[in-house]
Amino acid sequence: MATETHDNAITIASLGLLAYASADIAHHVLGHGGACLALGGSIVSLSSVFVNCSLHGATIDLAGPLANLALGLAALLVAGVARPTATPTRLFWVLVAAFNLMWFSGQLVFSVATGTDDWAWAMHRFSIGAPGRYGLIAVGALCYFVTYFFAAAGMVNLSHPRARARRIILIVWLTAGVTACATAALDHDAVRALLLQAIPQSFLLSIGLLWVPARAASRSTNTSPAAAVSFSVRWVIGAAIVGVASILVLGPGMIATN
């Protein structure tokens, strides 16, 4: 009989908040915002759901998803070398990789399929026709499923019993969504920000996480379950700082003043 493991919900929620915030900040601040400044433009406004640059173009648009791709791949490598016994740290990097790579690949599929969002300008700029669009959609879908399998592999030692992994993922997914919505609620056009940006980029792009526990449990041998995630002051304080800063700064957005 499996020994029941009690993971601390507050610490898990903190890991989820920080992991999701890494994707949001990478996309909007480092990606779009960084490219805007690097190309000599100025940021007119920047929030958790939109960046308005004085310059426009495919480079700035693609910088957001490409920043997610870069951070996601880096996190994947870190998670791969993290000690299996370092449960919170390894779980954090697995989640960072999952949120960033699911954002990149999920948005790629949606943007190319609908001709909107970050990939739209690039498709127009480079005259990408139907065959190219179908190819990009296939690449995005493949990347999403590879990310799903990676996340499941990273959760194997947390998946016995399956209810343990299910609880962890549900807390993480809900925390990400609530954080995104709480931040967007302070936007000057809150309803639009919530319905068209915050909810899709948090709940929908990462919805594949909800199937991770079943996949992880199917691969679990129950030979070396990870230690329980205990209450961690440093993770909780870190999440509190990032969460409050995100809501109060990126929520209403930063607007340039002349």
Mark where each language-model region is.
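Membrane-interface helix-boundary motifs at transmembrane edges
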Residues: G80-R90, V156-A165, N222-V229
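Metalloprotease/metallohydrolase-associated module, dominated by Zn2+-dependent proteases
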Residues: S45-L46, N52-G154, I169-A180, A184-H188, ...
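Juxtamembrane boundary at the C-terminal end of a transmembrane helix
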Residues: S246-N258
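Alpha-helical membrane-embedded segments
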Residues: Q201-W211, G238-V244
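Small-residue-rich helix-interface/hinge motifs
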Residues: A9, L15-N68, G72
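Short, Lys/Arg-rich, polar N-terminal cytosolic tail immediately upstream
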Residues: M1-A9
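Interfacial loop-to-transmembrane junctions
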Residues: A217-V242
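Short, aromatic-rich membrane-interface segments at the entry and exit
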Residues: P88-R90, V191-A198
